[in-house]
Amino acid sequence: MIFPRKKPAPVTAPWWQAQTRAKSSKGSVALIAVLAGAAGGILGVNASGASIFNRVNLVSSTSTIQRAPDSVAGTAQRVLPSVVSIQTRSLTGGGTGSGFFIDSDGYILTNNHVISSAAQTGGRIQVKLNDGRIFTAKVVGRDASYDLAVLKIAASGLKALQFGDSDQVAVGDSVIAIGSPLGLSGTVTTGIISAKNRPVTAGDSSNESSFINALQTDAAINPGNSGGPLVDSTGSVIGVNSAIA
């Protein structure tokens, strides 16, 4: 008895290997998508070399994102113009920190340890605003026991931050820290109040250190954040970032 010879199954390459033109069937089509704006097309070439074009309509959205004023983004947008970056140069080296305007005439609150070396040795203190302008600042006053200092720049019409009541802050309240960690100005981090009345020693040297009862937060704070504001959900200042764990 003679059985008909079975036709061997065609051997196909795995999907990840390119097919040669000789092995491509006439019905196969290579497609390249071309998308532009709200309308576009699909351009391709079939096995015979003829071009094909199928038009497609794409829907684009022109709506803008509406953010609540008390959202993190909304609060940061209001606070950022009032926050500055601080760079110091002194005989012992340089440093960076943050600060914020406490009135419209150029008065800035920061940490004493940010500018203490420059203040002691007659060094230079430069302040960079959120809009990119740079000013030389002078020290109006400083208090090592509270790790606070006030600077002044020759500018006016500036946006100052409002102060809140840190005594009314509760553990678990949301907070936002803004400053220039690692020299990265305009950095925003969020967290909560983790604890109150934490005993903290702040400062760079033993003769100008301070022992304060501080608010503890889990918001990311790094070198360069010192002197920047810690604000509540309304954008009011409830603390000054002075130390990191």
Feature names for model-found ranges:
Residues 1-18:
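N-terminal targeting leaders characterized by basic, low-complexity, disordered sequences
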Residues 2-5, 22-245:
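Serine-dependent protease modules
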